[in-house]
Amino acid sequence: VRGVLYKMSDASKDTVVEISGKLVEDCSEIRALCLRTQDFLSAVMASGKLSEAQADRTTDMIFIVDNLDRITEHLKDINENVNAIQQSDIKYSNTAAEDLNKYTLKLIDMYETSIIGLVGDVGVDRKKLELTRSELFELRAKMFRAHTKRVQKGKCDASLTAPFGSLLQDLETIASGCMDIADQVEEQHTIEIDLSSDSDEQ
């Protein structure tokens, strides 16, 4: 997921079609991996070898993977959106592209802040997350108002309003997903699961 966000932020006017097309494929692969991970964790739950605490933590992990899957689904939608529009006769403006890049960079910061607890003992900085999310809400509103002004002045085609609005909604949903992950990461650091056979006790 982090790699997809970084590649999105690196895309230029000349490379956006190629990169977005590749990222659609990458997102499909990530979602398939999420599904396999969920299946594995569900099988662990069904093994009957978890303590109550371990079962709770595994449930949290399943929830986190589900959120990663939903985030990836919206990333795929965004890249399909951008790929289709930028290959059409009517394209997003350079200003819109720059604003989308700013939003993506903030999403990277938010995602990394929310997920950091999964790879270490560092706590999640909730204050930073809430501040970034607030900034993203404001940026989304600013971007949409700027788009409508461009339409009003004839600098942007009105037919782009719906896909641009959908794109912004996908971005905001990803931000919400990051907050959901952070909620679980605060409770989920290390899972110790004993999957050994019970045969030694027999």
Region spans (language model):
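Cytosolic, long alpha-helical scaffolding segments
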Residues: V1-Q202
